[in-house]
């Protein structure tokens, strides 16, 4: 996938690291971008949980997302998945207000071995949650991965 930094991102290049994939609706969803910023703000807590990197994925064109990522000073990869190929592979567009035309609000933690260690989908009915405080996300991750907290 194309990154807002102009490079092509390939998850296989992150082998040996835990990567939190954050699938979101994109530039028209301000709470989604607030979530992206909050993930960056809480990077130390995520690292303490074993998350080496965060990646944000949406279906908007990379040039549009580049402006938003720059405005928000996001330092981690922001990726464009315009045909929803990666999103569909992770079923991230199965949940959310827009049906399958856009991602919902899904998180997938890919472990160092490339396997999914944890996932959660917050964008679906009945609540359509577009922002989850990161401490709540961390608590959900701890519970889902059975890490004492």
Write out the residue ranges for each language-model feature.
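Structural microenvironment flanking redox-active thiols in thiol-disulfide oxidoreductases
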Residues: 33-75
């Amino acid at each position: 996938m194309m990154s807002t930094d102009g490079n092509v991102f390939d998850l296989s290049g992150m082998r040996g690291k835990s990567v939190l994939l954050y699938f979101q609706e994109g530039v028209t969803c301000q709470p989604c971008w607030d979530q992206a910023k909050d993930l960056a703000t809480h990077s130390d807590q995520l690292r303490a949980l074993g998350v080496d990197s965060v990646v944000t994925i949406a279906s908007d064109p990379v040039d549009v997302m580049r402006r938003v990522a720059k405005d928000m000073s996001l330092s981690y990869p922001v990726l464009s998945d315009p045909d929803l190929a990666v999103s569909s592979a992770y079923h991230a567009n199965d949940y959310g207000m827009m049906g399958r035309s856009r991602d919902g609000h899904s998180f997938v933690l890919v472990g160092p071995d490339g396997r999914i260690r944890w996932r959660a989908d917050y964008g679906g009915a009945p609540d359509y949650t577009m922002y989850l405080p990161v401490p709540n996300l961390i608590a959900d991750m701890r519970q889902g991965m059975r890490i004492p907290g």
